C-alpha cells in the first residue's frame, strides 16, 4: 500500500480540505505535477485548473484559480487564491472567474499582458474540463 502525506487546501475564505492523501495532482504554472510521500521539497505556483487528491474516501477534486503549493516528503500545503470543490462548481461561479480574468487582461500593463492572457486561457480551459 502506498504511503500518505498530509494534504491541506486553504483559500483566504476558508479551509477546504485537510486529510491524509496517497497522491495530490497539482496544476502547476510550469506544468502539472503529482506529489506523493517522499517528494523532494518544492514550492510551486499554481495556474487555474483542477487539483485532485486521492484520500481515504476516494478522489476529491477542486477547481483553483491560482496560488502556491509547498510540498515536502510528508505534506503538501496549497494556498489557493480561490478554490471550489468540483461538485459545488457551477456555471455562474466559472463565469465570475472568467469575468475577473477578462478584466485583468483589459487593465494589464504591456509587460503583464502575456501572463494575464495565459490566465484567461487557463480559466477557459478550466470551464471546458469542468464540463460547463
UniProtKB/Swiss-Prot annotation:
Gene3D superfamilies: F0F1 ATP synthase delta/epsilon subunit, N-terminal. It holds the Pfam family ATP-synt_DE_N. It is a peripheral membrane protein. The keyword Ion transport applies. It is found in: Cell inner membrane. InterPro entries: ATP_synth_F1_dsu/esu, ATP_synth_F1_dsu/esu_N, ATPsynth_dsu/esu_N. Keywords: ATP synthesis, Cell inner membrane, Cell membrane, CF(1), Hydrogen ion transport, Ion transport, Membrane, Transport. GO terms for molecular function: ATP binding; proton-transporting ATP synthase activity, rotational mechanism. The keyword Ion transport applies. It comes from the Bacteria. One of its GO terms (cellular component) is proton-transporting ATP synthase complex. PANTHER family: ATP SYNTHASE DELTA/EPSILON CHAIN (PTHR13822), ATP SYNTHASE EPSILON CHAIN, CHLOROPLASTIC (PTHR13822:SF10). Belongs to the ATPase epsilon chain family. F-type ATPases have 2 components, CF(1) - the catalytic core - and CF(0) - the membrane proton channel. CF(1) has five subunits: alpha(3), beta(3), gamma(1), delta(1), epsilon(1). CF(0) has three main subunits: a, b and c. Produces ATP from ADP in the presence of a proton gradient across the membrane. This is ATP synthase epsilon chain. It comes from Cereibacter sphaeroides (strain ATCC 17025 / ATH 2.4.3) (Rhodobacter sphaeroides). The lineage of its organism: Bacteria, Pseudomonadati, Pseudomonadota, Alphaproteobacteria, Rhodobacterales.
Amino acid at each position: 500500500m502506498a504511503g500518505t502525506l498530509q494534504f491541506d487546501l486553504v483559500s483566504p475564505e476558508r479551509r477546504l480540505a485537510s486529510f491524509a492523501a496517497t497522491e495530490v495532482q497539482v496544476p502547476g504554472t510550469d506544468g502539472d505535477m503529482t506529489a506523493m510521500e517522499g517528494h523532494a521539497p518544492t514550492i510551486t505556483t499554481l495556474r487555474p485548473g483542477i487539483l485532485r487528491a486521492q484520500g481515504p474516501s476516494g478522489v476529491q477534486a477542486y477547481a483553483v484559480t491560482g496560488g502556491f503549493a509547498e510540498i515536502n516528503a510528508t505534506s503538501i500545503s496549497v494556498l489557493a487564491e480561490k478554490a471550489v470543490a468540483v461538485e459545488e462548481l457551477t456555471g455562474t461561479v466559472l463565469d465570475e472567474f472568467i469575468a475577473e480574468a477578462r478584466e485583468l487582461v483589459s487593465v494589464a500593463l504591456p509587460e503583464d499582458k502575456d501572463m494575464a492572457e495565459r490566465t484567461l486561457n487557463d480559466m477557459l480551459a478550466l470551464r471546458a474540463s469542468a464540463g460547463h
